[in-house]
């Protein structure tokens, strides 16, 4: 897929490079453009033993320009082509599945004072197999994927102008395998379980970053010696469906080898904290619970009340906490519809996040209240429209996102009301 760099909201943050300290700069803004072209061809009985084929081609062009006041700062461009071929084989008894091939060619470039990643070309070739077997009360899912990832960097120096640095090539062969099952004990009760092994090649940013990343207000330093990241994922769950009442619960564990993450070095460069891409083993454990009650429809409309909770904890092999972990959350919501009208209210309570990495600050908890009211309509030829009024952060809380390095500089947006129209055709 595309690599999008720096498209987060910037607000009115001031650029703080020391080399420009003598001149006052305007607010940082961005202008972005994305063009996407898709084509798909499908047919039947392409080869003996296969009942269906599908070929999908996607071409995506992405460009965004960062402005400092009225002056162009840095231009990021990403052009990618993705070709995916799928062959669905004839049924093997209770088994149905797909063999596939995928090829992606991605060119990325950044030009300007804020470029922090060198120009790169990434070619990814992959073969995969997905299979599903249905055996009365049991459903079994299997999957395999093999990739070859080649990254070419003509010039590893990240400079607006000046000398040319050495080129660099990286080559990785990630492999993944998974197996999962769903056991339908009855119409009301089901159990799920899965285990997977997955490898991931380090990304361009993780390998080659070296400069100020204005979108996150940090100075990023990559590590070209990073190796593949791998994880063993084990998950178990249960679902309950008693008609109007339903619920589900999931627990999971991830055991990473050579987990890739950013750590705060404690140093500063150009007035920004230096974050270094590193890797070491890590373990994650987490759980999620969802509950819903569907009230009988009445003259007052159709009401549903729901709640969810989630928690995850991550620890590195040196017994320190994984940086930027999300907080524990509990939530309560209400959905309503009557005729062409729909509405919803959602309250989320996030607890304090005190399990933080070295040099990372604690993040206070918060209460987030959102609501939306919408009128829906339709016309001819699948034309649909929606007029909506949406309120976000209705309690006007100061919300800090523990998963962002910007949390100490930029809280999330306060109380805001949005009126809009959506059109679908």
Model-based region annotation:
Residues 30-184, 190, 196, 248-252, ...:
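Face-selective signature of the C-terminal outer-membrane beta-barrel domain
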């Amino acid at each position: 897929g595309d690599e999008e760099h720096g498209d987060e909201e910037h607000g009115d943050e001031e650029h703080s490079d020391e080399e420009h300290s003598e001149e006052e700069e305007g607010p940082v803004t961005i202008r972005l453009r994305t063009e996407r072209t898709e084509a798909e061809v499908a047919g039947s009985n392409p080869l003996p033993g296969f009942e269906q084929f599908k070929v999908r081609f996607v071409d995506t062009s992405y460009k965004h320009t960062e402005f400092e006041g009225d002056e162009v700062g840095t231009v990021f461009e990403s052009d990618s082509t993705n070709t995916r071929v799928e062959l669905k084989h004839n049924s093997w008894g209770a088994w149905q599945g797909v063999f596939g091939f995928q090829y992606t060619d991605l060119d990325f470039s950044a030009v300007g004072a804020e470029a922090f990643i060198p120009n790169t070309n990434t070619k990814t070739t992959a073969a995969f197999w997905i299979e599903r077997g249905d055996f009365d009360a049991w459903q079994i899912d299997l999957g395999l994927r093999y990739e070859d990832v080649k990254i070419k960097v003509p010039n590893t120096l990240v400079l607006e102008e000046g000398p040319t640095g050495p080129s660099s090539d990286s080559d990785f062969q990630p492999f993944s395998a998974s197996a999962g099952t769903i056991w339908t004990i009855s119409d009301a009760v089901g159990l799920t379980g899965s285990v997977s092994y997955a490898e991931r090649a380090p990304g361009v940013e993780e390998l080659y970053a070296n400069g100020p990343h204005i979108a996150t207000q940090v100075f990023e330093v990559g590590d070209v010696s990073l190796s593949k990241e791998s994880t063993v994922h084990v998950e178990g769950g249960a679902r309950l469906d008693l008609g109007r009442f339903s619920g589900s619960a999931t627990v999971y564990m991830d055991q990473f080898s050579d987990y890739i993450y950013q750590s705060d070095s404690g140093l500063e460069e150009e007035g920004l904290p230096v974050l270094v891409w590193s890797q070491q083993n890590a373990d994650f454990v987490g759980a999620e619970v969802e509950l819903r009650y569907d009230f009988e429809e009445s003259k007052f409309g159709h009401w549903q009340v729901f709640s969810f909770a989630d928690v995850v904890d991550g620890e590195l092999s040196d017994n320190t906490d994984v940086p930027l972990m999300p907080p524990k959350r509990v939530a309560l919501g209400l959905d309503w519809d009557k005729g062409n009208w729909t509405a919803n209210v959602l309250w989320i309570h996030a607890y304090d996040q005190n399990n933080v990495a070295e040099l990372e600050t604690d993040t206070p908890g918060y209460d987030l209240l959102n609501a939306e009211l919408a009128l829906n309509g339709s016309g001819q030829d699948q034309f649909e429209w929606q007029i909506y009024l949406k309120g976000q952060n209705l309690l006007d809380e100061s919300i800090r996102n523990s998963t962002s390095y910007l949390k100490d500089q930029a809280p999330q947006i306060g109380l805001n009301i949005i009126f809009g129209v959506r059109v679908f055709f």
